[in-house]
């Protein structure tokens, strides 16, 4: 192994250790023709870290969807700066606002779920008292328990939109862009909450240009101030929305696995690809389109 190869493997292992300490799953680095590479998985998808070796030295590259929260967090860990900066990233929690979040956008199987929750100063305290925090810090069992508590809180105003894979595929074909679909769904959830309770602000996690949400908002929605920020789950209403969305997503898997006697894996891993091949070959393409988001690269491998 050359000196450049040795420095490259040392470099990628150092990065992977740092990434794992932040709670992400990583694969073991493998050697390709000109680089060492490893996969990184998060809740909203997967990306790849590559460290190239040549006579000129080493080059680090992060490969994947730049709009994924996973990509932005890992980019920050490696390069020490945020890929996207936003004046809204330092906003304080408003007195009353709507928080939105989604679950399932990085998973081949399952629905895309978007939830919106209204809160004010007093209700924020109630949400915190029942354990509301970022759903990524909670087990599936805890998510189910806290989601139930959120729904039972007196005066809780929320909306959950679960887009089944079959409906998702129709909408994606129509819109041709995941961010447009996300924008439409977030806007719909915000509008549904506004029909029950007026609010002047809304906060969502940053997944793309604000225009994707604004362009889909109706009359009431266009009057609010929208903040799209990274790590938006630090805001209580967004954290509550993330729990409701994740709970709906998990329940879909429990229901479908029981009804169809399938153990559908989450994410977009090799296991997912193997299960998708089984479904297509044994149950048919019509069944697959009712269970999976077909625009994923996984479909092309089947």
Predicted regions and their residues:
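RNase H-like, Mg2+-dependent phosphodiesterase core
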Residues: 1-98, 102-302
């Amino acid at each position: 192994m050359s000196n450049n190869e040795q420095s490259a493997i040392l470099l990628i292992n150092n990065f992977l250790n740092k990434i794992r300490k932040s709670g992400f799953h990583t694969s073991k680095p493998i050697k390709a023709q000109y680089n060492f590479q490893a996969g990184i998985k998060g809740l909203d998808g997967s990306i790849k870290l590559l460290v190239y070796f040549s006579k000129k030295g080493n080059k680090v590259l992060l490969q994947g969807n730049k709009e994924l929260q996973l990509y932005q967090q890992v980019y920050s860990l490696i390069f020490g700066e945020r890929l996207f900066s936003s004046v809204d990233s330092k906003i304080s929690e408003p007195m009353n606002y709507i928080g939105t979040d989604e679950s399932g956008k990085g998973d081949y199987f399952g629905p895309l779920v978007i939830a919106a929750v209204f809160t004010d100063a007093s209700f924020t305290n109630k949400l915190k008292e029942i354990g509301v925090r970022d759903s990524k810090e909670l087990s599936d069992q805890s998510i189910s328990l806290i989601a139930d508590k959120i729904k039972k809180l007196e005066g809780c105003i929320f909306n959950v939109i679960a887009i089944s894979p079959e409906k998702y595929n129709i909408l994606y074909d129509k819109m041709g862009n995941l961010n447009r679909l996300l924008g439409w769904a977030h806007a719909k959830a915000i509008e549904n909450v506004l029909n029950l309770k007026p609010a002047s602000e809304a906060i969502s996690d940053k997944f793309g240009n604000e225009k994707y949400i604004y362009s889909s908002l109706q009359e009431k929605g266009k009057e609010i101030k929208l903040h799209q920020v990274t790590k938006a789950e630090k805001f209580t209403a967004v954290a509550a929305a993330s729990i409701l969305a994740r709970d709906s997503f998990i329940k879909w898997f429990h229901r479908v696995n029981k009804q169809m006697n399938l153990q559908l894996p989450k994410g977009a891993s090799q296991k997912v690809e193997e299960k998708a091949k089984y479904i297509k070959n044994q149950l048919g393409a019509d069944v697959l389109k009712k269970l999976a988001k077909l625009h994923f690269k996984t479909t092309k491998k089947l």
